[in-house]
Amino acid sequence: MLLSSLGEAVGLLVSGDTELLSITINSLNFAVSSTVLAALIGIPLGIVMAVRDFPCKRTVVSISHTLMGLPTVVVGLLVFSLLSRSGPFGGLGLLFSPPAVIIGQAVLALPIVISLVYGGLSRLDPELYETLVTLGASRFQRTLKIAREGRIAVASAVLTAFGRVVGEVGVAMMLGGNIRWYTRTITTAIALETARGAFTLSIALGIVLMVVAFGVNFGLNYLVKFRPGSGAV
Amino acid sequence: MRALYSQAAPALWVQGLRFSYPALNGARSQAAEPVVAIDDLQLGAGEIAVLIGENGSGKTTFLKILAGLLGPQSGQIEAALNGVPSVGGVRSAAPVLVHQKPYLFAESVFSNVAYPLRVRKVAREELRRRTLSALNTLGLQGLAGRWAPSLSGGEKQRVAIARALVLRPSILLLDEPSSNIDDGSVRTIERVLRELAESGVAVIMSTHNLASAYRLADRIVPMAAGRRIPLEVNVLRGTAIEAHDEHIGVFQTVQGLQIYCPAGNEGARTAVIRMDDIILSGEEITTSAQNRLQGNVTAVEGLGHDLFNVKLNCDGIVLRATVTQTSMEELAIRPGTMLHVTFKASAVKLY
């Protein structure tokens, strides 16, 4: 049965089935948007944590590290309670819409981006910061340069966060609701189709997801091996 | 040859400086001993001051304070900063520091050196011209396109100095610029620092390398435990000229006085005599020592532990000798006393 399904799945992939395409586009759209959102907030925060001293810094770092292991269903629950009709942001009517999934996945990705950017940049030479100060760079210019010097760490952080959100099912299910043509993602579709016994679409989607996941891992490996000199992490 | 002490307005003036590191646990440190305590240091435009001292003597910390990287608890630093424009008033300009192990950005040598101009939004043509000129000064013109992190230690040090020079600072700070680098780079750096000083830049550098310090310094600033300590040597400028005979050479000071020194050092520009090696006497004494001068005591300074530092004017050159309390009394040394000054040719070290 599995073999015949696999054959049909490949056929589905080759034929460019519109539902398969819609689900894949949704998944990538949510994952990319949430990763970009998390990167926009998380990269500057990670840099600030790496280059500046502030009260309770170690506590903040520990919390950020701990939150990397945040269970997806807990994030789903948390954001659900905020966005549900009776919640504080219920009036926005976002629940079971793409923005809800993106927000939830961004919450999931944020601690990963912050922690990995912080970890990578704090291993940069401390003299980088002093050099930038003595050469007269402004605070903003220093931040840009530090991110550039630690660009490999920053890119790894973003890719890791993307890998985490593209393959998660809890947030997408709880906040998106798995609505066909609207919020259905690869993971929620696989969960539903498999439960229904419809393996063909599940397997086709599984292949797509694995290609994406392997692609991200390949990119990470390439980055880690690519260390041009001492400026890289 | 430059004057030993410039008469111009000071380029840098440090007064009553006290710095201690904050306690690690964040608690207010209980009046910890300052790690740097410099009561007074003045440096004229075009002067080179060299900080010498052991590891942990506070040289690096002092340089970082002067560069504005560390904030002292008290004291004043006044610096003439006409060369370094600030960026949009975000941070007032300060002397530029070149670290002991400079951090080069992971990009080309040219981009590294151009960076300080780029952050100041200098126009492209001028940026290019000034960057290439700084690279030329350090003999790096052939390396402009190279990937900076792949350079050798000496090349990296030169790139870092070029990156500081591109700003045309009026005060340049260097932390151990000649440690762990090849002789060729050391010579290039020494030549560049000399040229910079001649163009009016005040240079403060720290070093372990005493020979380099004596060759370069207009002023040697010995440090220990974060404080200035008295210099224990006389440093004379001049030229080692033709040998007196095969064993003894002659060093002619810039003031015109000739002193005997070991032969075989023709071309040396600096003579160094330890203050301990100078014998003062009321009458001329007959010894093996070749250098017999006469000097007029101009100042006497207590060093503690019953030791005194006597400053004499010997035919235009200033020499300092260390004597004990007993000798002070026996020779009745006070300002104005005429004394015979004797030291061996072999006590004169040439650099």
Where is each model-derived feature located?
Chain B
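Conserved ABC ATPase signature
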Residues: 147-151, 155
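The feature captures the beta-strand-to-loop junction immediately N-terminal to the Walker
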Residues: 52-54
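Glycine/charge-rich catalytic "coupling/switch" loops of P-loop NTPases
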Residues: 255-301, 325-351
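Conserved ABC ATPase "signature" region
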Residues: 125-143
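Catalytic Walker B motif of ABC-type/P-loop ATPase nucleotide-binding domains
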Residues: 172-176
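Helix-to-loop junction immediately C-terminal to a conserved catalytic motif
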Residues: 67
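Hydrophobic anchor residue at the start of the ABC signature
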Residues: 161
